[in-house]
Amino acid sequence: ARARSVAQGKPVVLAAYQSVYSKASAEESEQANKLTMATLFSHGATQLLAGEGGNVLVDPYYVNNHKAADSTVEMLKRWYDFLVEHDEILMDPRIAEVTDSFAGPLNEDVEVAYDNLCVTEDPKEGAVWRRVTTTPHGLVVHLINLVGQKDTLWDGPKRSGILVEGGRLTLRCCAGRTPRVFVADPDGSGHLEELRVHCEGAQAKVDLPPLQVWQVLRVIL
């Protein structure tokens, strides 16, 4: 947010080189990279990573790059395609963080819950990290899966994500008006897909699909 405030409309690109690729297995490195990208993309930023010839940057000295596994190249293509497709709800400079205004114990306009799991406003190992932003195209809820991780170090090896099921989104809405909710997942179809909404008075409830690494929920109240 600070970088965007001084960027004067320029893209925010972090020199967040993933040195983990040169130190850990492709699987552990890809998981770390996914969590890094989920964090950056959901905040409207990207990183310096993809090099030439299927290599990834692991060091500020670009000669020290790493030949990416085929699975890494496919993953990066999938995630970059996702970023481009959903640019309007991820990268628009008018997007603002509103988590504290919409979620939490004092403001329950947007709530996400899972059985026997913590949902947090800050990244914490073992939890689902929830953020809410306002965009020109409605509210967006970001869910990032840190369940099963031992730490939140962005450039350290990460275990394969534990699939988190049983999530429910609850919205406070105007009686007689049904909100629309869409979900997208870079490790799923990659496209926004509409979810079924069930209204109970001033509340609308939505059963969420299983959470892999990152889900983007677009909410039109």
What are these regions, as identified by a protein language model?
Residues Y17, I144-L146, R172-C174, P209, ...:
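Structured loops at beta-to-helix junctions and adjacent beta-edge loops in soluble globular domains
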Residues A24, A50, D151-L153, P179-V181, ...:
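Short acidic, gly/pro-rich beta-turn/loop elements at beta-sheet edges
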Residues R180-A204:
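Solvent-exposed beta-strand/loop surfaces of large extracellular or lumenal domains
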Residues E200-L221:
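C-terminal beta-strand-rich structural cap/linker in extracellular carbohydrate-active enzymes
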Residues S19-V20, L146-G148, G176, G188:
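Short, glycine-/Ser/Thr-/acidic-enriched flexible segments
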Residues A38, V112-A175, Q215:
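Carbohydrate-binding surface patches
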Residues A1-Y114, T120-E121, V132-T133, L192, ...:
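Glycan-processing catalytic domains of CAZymes
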